[in-house]
Amino acid sequence: MSRRTRAILRPVTADPLYASRLVTMMTNKLMKEGKKATAERILYSALERVQERTGREPLDVFNQAVLNCTPRIEVKARRVGGATYQVPMEVRQERGTSLALRWLVQFSRKRSGKSMVDKLSNELMDAANDTGSAVRKREETHRMAEANKAFAHYRY
């Protein structure tokens, strides 16, 4: 068992433009090599582009996209005897949100296109409409949990 204490989580402050903690979390996930201003500019531009294309409030589209990508259940490997079982576990809210943001950024980067602004805005709009790679990843995670439901009694 680990002797280390758990890391104290620092509170995430709301971003100045949208006054949303979720936007700050997304900025931090987008950031590469400490370039927060660049990540912020990309995210704000993507949200503006979402507003231009959909005509809806960009924060609403963003929140809906994150909600649609958030997994409710996932599988974790558990070793019992000599076998490793994929045990379905409920996902805590903070982890679910973190996974959703990670998947949105990951699949935005994989998209074909010229600029990150375009790729991110397209992924956000797709996720808000319950399509897109990030939503597919959540469904795949849920399918894995459903397939391994027989091992739920190994939960820890």
Curated annotation (Swiss-Prot):
Which InterPro entries has this protein been placed in? Ribosomal_uS7, Ribosomal_uS7_bac/org-type, Ribosomal_uS7_CS, Ribosomal_uS7_dom, Ribosomal_uS7_dom_sf
Q: From the UniProt record, list the coiled-coil ranges.
A: none
This entry carries the following GO cellular component terms, namely:
cytosolic small ribosomal subunit; ribosome
Top-rank taxon of the source lineage equals Bacteria
GO MF annotations for this entry?
Answer: mRNA binding; rRNA binding; structural constituent of ribosome; tRNA binding
Single GO BP term: translation
What Gene3D superfamilies does the entry give? Ribosomal protein S7 domain
Pfam family membership, one: Ribosomal_S7
Keyword list, A-Z: Ribonucleoprotein, Ribosomal protein, RNA-binding, rRNA-binding, tRNA-binding
PROSITE patterns listed in its UniProt record: RIBOSOMAL_S7
Binding partners and assembly: Part of the 30S ribosomal subunit. Contacts proteins S9 and S11.
Q: What does this protein do?
A: One of the primary rRNA binding proteins, it binds directly to 16S rRNA where it nucleates assembly of the head domain of the 30S subunit. Is located at the subunit interface close to the decoding center, probably blocks exit of the E-site tRNA.
Q: Name the family the entry cites.
A: Belongs to the universal ribosomal protein uS7 family.
Protein name as it appears in the record: Small ribosomal subunit protein uS7
Q: Which organism is it from?
A: Gloeobacter violaceus (strain ATCC 29082 / PCC 7421)
From the UniProt record, report the name of the gene that encodes this protein: rpsG
